[in-house]
UniProtKB/Swiss-Prot annotation:
Residues 66-148 form the Lipoyl-binding domain. Its cofactor is (R)-lipoate. Binds 1 lipoyl cofactor covalently. The modification N6-lipoyllysine is found at K107. It comes from the Eukaryota. The glycine cleavage system catalyzes the degradation of glycine. The H protein (GCSH) shuttles the methylamine group of glycine from the P protein (GLDC) to the T protein (GCST). Has a pivotal role in the lipoylation of enzymes involved in cellular energetics such as the mitochondrial dihydrolipoyllysine-residue acetyltransferase component of pyruvate dehydrogenase complex (DLAT), and the mitochondrial dihydrolipoyllysine-residue succinyltransferase component of 2-oxoglutarate dehydrogenase complex (DLST). PROSITE patterns: BIOTINYL_LIPOYL (PS50968), LIPOYL (PS00189). This is Glycine cleavage system H protein, mitochondrial. One of its GO terms (biological process) is glycine decarboxylation via glycine cleavage system. It is found in: Mitochondrion. Keywords: Disease variant, Lipoyl, Mitochondrion, Neurodegeneration, Transit peptide.
Amino acid sequence: MALRVVRSVRALLCTLRAVPSPAAPCPPRPWQLGVGAVRTLRTGPALLSVRKFTEKHEWVTTENGIGTVGISNFAQEALGDVVYCSLPEVGTKLNKQDEFGALESVKAASELYSPLSGEVTEINEALAENPGLVNKSCYEDGWLIKMTLSNPSELDELMSEEAYEKYIKSIEE
């Protein structure tokens, strides 16, 4: 019993980091780095995926040569409640700036333009039954199409998120 009490008191002191003697160090905690430990930063395609924007308010993220395309928050707010999405068929080949579909809302209709050249590999089927996803989650569940990129260097011509925010401010003035 006395040993159990000593262990309990020691555990409490270790928790508080008030160990009475250096001869009895606290056991290492699994989440702490030991002496001489090295921490590494891992980078991978998911971490390096950056959202890029066009002047027509489409965005694209890329991973392993596949681009996911949607519209920006600014665009969905300007449109209002989206009630219909017209999207291309899988296999459609697009050049940069080609019109590939349209969004209709209670306020307006807006054409969609491809931010990059490539071939449509997937469309967001959920938008057929729930086009409002574009409003609710324009950067996640409200994406429009996925496409293979035929010219990945075109990404360099698109705006970063920071540059896009400056662009939005300039057109709102």
